[in-house]
Swiss-Prot record:
PANTHER family: COBALT-PRECORRIN-5B C(1)-METHYLTRANSFERASE (PTHR35863:SF1). InterPro entries: CbiD, CbiD_sf. The gene is cbiD. The lineage of its organism: Bacteria, Pseudomonadati, Pseudomonadota, Betaproteobacteria, Burkholderiales. Its EC number is 2.1.1.195. One of its GO terms (molecular function) is cobalt-precorrin-5B C1-methyltransferase activity. The keyword S-adenosyl-L-methionine applies. This is Cobalt-precorrin-5B C(1)-methyltransferase. GO terms for biological process: anaerobic cobalamin biosynthetic process; methylation. Keywords: Cobalamin biosynthesis, Methyltransferase, S-adenosyl-L-methionine, Transferase.
Length: 362
């Protein structure tokens, strides 16, 4: 019998950003006002020149203008806004230019440190430019010399925003309208890394000199309890230790505490800046070597090398009086100090699965 050809996995689908959705819907609403044309799809040009056609859910006149909506398609990316209705309401204005407003589900900036001034709707610069470019071209096409008031909204955006970093960044009332290329790349890390950078920038702009970068909820709780730090000082770095350390080169703070599970910290100690299991693994022989330098006997070293997990290796070392947690933190500290400016005072903390400190280095 002939063997079947193995099925090839389908390539992951790209999607479109909330900025692209806002551009398409604002253009459609404005076109209805200027040309009397109600589209069911609209073509937009992305920042790198690609032309894409975006389907609309509705395009209709309102009492004071027009509105259009589209369903956000993030492709195969697990985006919190995937499937959300993004809409624009456009009104014509006598004064030229484009003015942006936060509609339902779009947040407002309340803290300094972001790319937008306090009080502005959380519609980022590239989406603003995309909308402005398209609306100005439409106005020129129809000989219109006035301006536009553009209100962007996201259905259910206030609840969705609670699943993002917006509340901690001081963006209240909803989501941000984002995107630099107009395209969502599946499982891209860029949005998460951008939120890390924004968190640091907001902390700096609000006078916070001591930040704590944490790998998860347990480490965040440990830092909050240990130092009584405000939420604004807590940076949720996840696996992206390198994103924190490298950003501090150009945006330094006086003091950085890094805290994570023992396994995550052992990866950083070995020189890995991405702590995800896809990109780095725990080096048990290296842990055994460090334990040996602290006096571990041959039997303990062999047991550590044969351990199933880093937690097991840690418990073996603890039972023998070897301060493996402190050793790992000391090596992680050296890695961090090689990256951040000398002006940044750095310290490391490792916790176990119960959130208890098992190592520290300063």
């Amino acid at each position: 019998m002939r063997d079947e050809t193995p099925e090839q996995p389908a390539p992951l689908r790209f999607g479109y950003t909330t900025g692209s959705c806002a551009t398409a819907t604002s253009l459609a609403a404005a076109r209805l006002l200027l040309a009397g044309q109600a589209d069911d799809a609209v073509e937009i040009v992305l920042p790198k020149g690609q032309r894409v056609m975006m389907r609309l859910e509705f395009c209709r006149a309102t009492a004071d203008g027009a509105e259009a909506g589209t369903i956000k398609d993030a492709g195969d990316d697990p985006d919190v806004t995937h499937g959300a209705l993004i809409f624009a309401r456009v009104a014509l204005a006598a004064a030229p230019g484009v003015r942006f407003h936060a509609g339902p589900g779009v947040g407002t900036v309340t803290r300094a440190g972001l790319t937008l001034p306090v009080g502005e709707p959380a519609i980022n610069p590239v989406p603003r430019q995309m909308m402005t470019t398209h609306l100005e071209a439409l106005a020129a096409e129809h000989g219109y010399a006035g301006g536009f008031d553009v209100t962007i909204g996201v259905e259910g955006g206030e609840a969705l925003a609670l699943k993002t970093m917006n509340p901690r960044l001081g963006i209240v009332g909803g989501l941000s309208i984002l995107g630099t290329t107009g395209i969502v790349r599946p499982f891209s890390c860029s949005a998460y890394i951008a939120s890390i950078h924004q968190g640091i920038d907001v902390a700096r702009a609000n006078g916070i000199a001591h930040i704590a970068a944490c790998t998860g909820n347990a480490s965040e709780d440990a830092m909050r309890a240990h130092y009584q730090l405000p939420d604004m000082a807590l940076i949720e770095m996840g696996d992206f230790a390198g994103a924190v350390l490298k950003h501090l080169r150009r945006a330094p703070v006086a003091r950085l505490s890094m805290c994570g599970g023992f396994g995550k910290l052992s990866k950083l100690a070995a020189g890995h800046l991405d702590l995800h299991s896809r990109h780095s693994s725990i080096d048990l022989p290296l842990l055994a070597q460090w334990a040996a330098e602290a006096g571990a006997n041959e039997a303990l070293q062999a047991a550590m090398r044969a351990a199933n997990t880093s937690q097991e290796a840690l418990k073996l070392a603890q039972a023998d009086g070897v301060p493996l947690g402190d050793l790992v933190c000391a090596h992680a500290l050296r890695v961090a100090r090689d990256i951040v400016p000398p002006s940044v005072a750095v310290e490391m903390f490792a916790i176990d699965r119960q959130g208890r400190f098992v190592g520290a280095a300063r």
